[in-house]
Design a protein with these regions (language model features):
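Short beta-strand segments
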Residues: 50, 76, 86, 317-319
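A short, structural micro-pattern
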Residues: 44-46, 70-72, 82, 186, ...
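Long, position-biased, composition-driven segments near the start of the mature protein
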Residues: 2-4, 93-95, 436-440
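Short, conserved beta-strand segments within well-ordered enzyme catalytic domains
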Residues: 51-53, 87-89, 193
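N-terminal "assembly arms/tails" that initiate or stabilize quaternary assembly
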Residues: 1-80
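Short acidic, glycine/tyrosine-flanked loop/strand segments centered on an H-E-D-like triad
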Residues: 73-102
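Short active-site-adjacent helix-start/loop capping segments
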Residues: 59-63, 86-88, 95-99, 416, ...
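Core alpha/beta structural scaffold of self-assembling particle/tube/pore-forming proteins
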Residues: 99-442
Length: 442
């Protein structure tokens, strides 16, 4: 017997899944120094830049006869020029028939996802201090736009790792901290941020060592945690930037010093090298790290002096390129560097001998950028944006990243459009001599 042909209606419903958000590992906001978070409230400060002091530097003379030296107030600036927003809009019909259909408004879930997205964007921007790639922005017709420049005053010039050899053991971490301290370092509050994917091999090698108490803790959490004396705190992030190096680093080319912009060695901020590929437009990229090589025939090994005391350390001289540099038709490349190198006596002397022709240096290839921060040297500003009268405005806080933001709700009169905007402005700076980049294979 044949089945009858029924005419049945199908009703598709939209059900809540209650799935959690795919969160990121947010630590930069957590470890930042928020002393200048609301610097716009400082009465005497005008503009979006606040300047703060760095410890003064002096030198010591032998004997009891004084040789007076200038007292110099060292400063660094924190510029609040970053801004971002996440927004969405609905018609009145969409609002009543879809977004607020449930007893619990779906608007809350839209807002939660928007806040998480913006928080991750800000966290990733803070991480760019690791390779000095935070963009310099300006305001044009109300919109924040990049100028093409970078905040090269922020971020480390020293580094650990070669970008090729894996960093996967506690011994390497211990050597890294030893190198960091050898130059001069704060005694408390050292923080290390590692790529999350590099944590398991480090923990794995640690579990192979006979350290029952430490290994019990690690096996329970599978985290590096803290170790050392005094303890060093280890964090992990999945938002760390990758330094895209120039040809010099990726081709492992050896550069040879031709000249510097200051032959006296009093203030070297630019070095001309030979040895790059002829007419290579991408020889050096801003943020590239270079290290002077040892055992060059007829040349003294370059070493940094300790930051305080001016004693020759064990640390080879490492520098950071502050701008892209192209090679000319002879394979020469002129590199602007940070920090300024000084071999002449004085409070800011930082190297043992002058940089002269014939010395050699090599740059790192592409690498993932981990970071060491000494104490509270990573500063963050995140001022509260004003209310947007007559639209309802509130201050929001993202519990996962710690980001503070403004939320504004409004409608376009007569246009059947209602929108929600989450926005924030901020700035950050990492004191160079208080930090070190960790070069993991990219």
């Amino acid at each position: 017997m044949a089945l009858p042909t029924n005419v049945l209606q199908q009703v598709q419903t939209y059900q809540r899944s209650n799935l959690a958000l795919l969160e990121n590992l947010n630590c930069f906001m957590n470890v930042s120094n928020t002393r200048f978070k609301d610097f716009e409230k400082i009465t005497a400060n005008l503009g979006s830049v606040v300047t703060f002091d760095l410890p003064p530097r002096f030198t010591t003379a032998q004997g009891l006869v004084a040789s007076f030296q200038p007292a110099v107030q060292r400063v660094l600036s924190l510029t609040c020029d970053q801004a971002t927003n996440t927004s969405y809009a609905f018609t009145a019909q969409e609002r009543i028939f879809n977004v607020e259909k449930d007893t619990e408004s779906y608007m809350e879930l839209f807002g939660r996802s928007a806040v998480a997205e913006m928080g991750a964007n800000i966290e990733a921007n803070l991480a760019l201090n690791s390779n000095s790639h935070v963009p310099v922005n300006t305001v044009v017709n109300g919109q924040t736009v990049p100028t093409g420049a970078l905040h090269t005053e922020s971020g480390p010039f020293r580094f650990f790792g070669d970008g090729v050899t894996p960093i996967n053991s506690f011994q390497q971490l211990a050597q890294m901290i030893a190198n960091f301290k050898n130059f001069g370092s704060v005694q408390q509050g050292i923080k290390v941020i590692l790529p999350d994917v590099n944590i398991p091999p480090i923990v794995g090698t640690g579990l192979n060592q006979f350290a029952p108490k430490r290994n019990d803790d690690m096996a329970m959490s599978w985290e590096v945690g803290e170790f050392g004396t005094p303890p060093v705190m280890y964090y992990q992030s999945n938002l760390l930037p990758t330094q895209t190096a120039g040809t010099v680093g990726n081709s492992a080319q050896t550069l040879t010093v031709v000249s510097t912009n200051d032959p006296t060695g009093a203030n070297i901020t630019q070095i001309t090298f030979s040895g790059a590929t002829v007419n290579d437009a991408n020889a050096i990229k801003s943020g590239d790290l270079l290290q002077f090589q040892d055992n060059v025939s007829g040349k003294t090994n370059l070493r940094y002096l300790t930051f305080i005391g001016h004693v020759i350390s064990n640390q080879p001289v490492q520098i950071r390129a502050t701008a892209d540099a192209a090679a000319d038709g002879s394979g020469n490349v002129v590199i602007n560097i940070s920090p300024a190198l000084q071999s002449t006596a004085g409070g800011t002397q930082n190297i043992n001998v002058n940089v002269i022709a014939g010395m050699q240096a090599k740059a790192l290839p592409n690498h993932k950028c981990g970071l060491i921060i000494g104490g509270d040297a990573f500063y963050l500003a995140m001022p509260r944006l004003p209310d947007q009268y007559p639209f309802p405005t509130a201050a929001e806080y993202d519990p996962d990243t710690g980001v503070s933001m403004r939320m504004t709700y409004g409608s376009l009169f007569g246009q059947n459009q209602m929108g929600m905007i989450h926005d924030s402005t901020w700035g950050s700076v990492l004191v160079p001599e208080y930090s070190m980049r960790i070069a993991f294979p990219a």
